[in-house]
Amino acid sequence: MMERFEKIEMKIPAKAEYVAIIRLTMAGVANRMGFAYDDIEDMKIAISEACTNIVQHAYKEDVGEIAIVFGLYENRLEIMVADNGVSFDFNNLKRKVGPYDISKPVEHLPENGLGLYLINTLMDDIQIMHDEGMTVLMTKYIQREQVENDGNPISTYESY
């Protein structure tokens, strides 16, 4: 049996001024689903990075579109961000991108390329497909229980 979900689809021009619309839409959807504030903030950064990457690299001189699909499941939100622009070799880039190396001076940090590392760090799962253009599928699971239910209550009174 196929898992039930609801789908929201959007298309925006691949311009920086429209990225905020996607970020706000995602935050509203995630809030309705019951995501924690910190998880929503993480997803806002991840979706901004994915869209900004398209704006900066996908279409060169042409103005294209960014397609966004939100898959709302009972336990997770899947976000697909896609373009039909210029693709790149993700596996090659992934080998070059990684966590900050504390032994290197800050002047040697790359100015770009950390977007995919950030997305990978902030989301629970990420898949990237590239053919004609690029598709990034990001998944974040809802963390409903933040505290163990059978723990002992904390008292504010001192015992003597």
Swiss-Prot record:
Species in which this protein is naturally found: Bacillus cereus (strain ATCC 14579 / DSM 31 / CCUG 7414 / JCM 2152 / NBRC 15305 / NCIMB 9373 / NCTC 2599 / NRRL B-3711)
| Enzyme Commission number(s) of this protein | 2.7.11.1
Q: What is this protein called?
A: Serine-protein kinase RsbW
The reply on keyword Acetylation is no
**Record GO biological process:** negative regulation of DNA-templated transcription
Catalytic reaction(s) noted: L-seryl-[protein] + ATP = O-phospho-L-seryl-[protein] + ADP + H(+); L-threonyl-[protein] + ATP = O-phospho-L-threonyl-[protein] + ADP + H(+)
Protein family per UniProt: Belongs to the anti-sigma-factor family.
Against InterPro entries, the record matches this protein to: Anti-sigma-factor_SerPK, HATPase_C_sf, RsbW
MF GO annotations: ATP binding; protein serine kinase activity; protein serine/threonine kinase activity; sigma factor antagonist activity
State the function annotated in the UniProt record: Negative regulator of sigma-B activity. Phosphorylates and inactivates its specific antagonist protein, RsbV. Upon phosphorylation of RsbV, RsbW is released and binds to sigma-B, thereby blocking its ability to form an RNA polymerase holoenzyme (E-sigma-B).
Top-level taxonomic group: Bacteria
Keyword check for Signal: no
Name the keywords, alphabetized. ATP-binding, Kinase, Nucleotide-binding, Serine/threonine-protein kinase, Transferase
CDD domains in alphabetical order: HATPase_RsbW-like
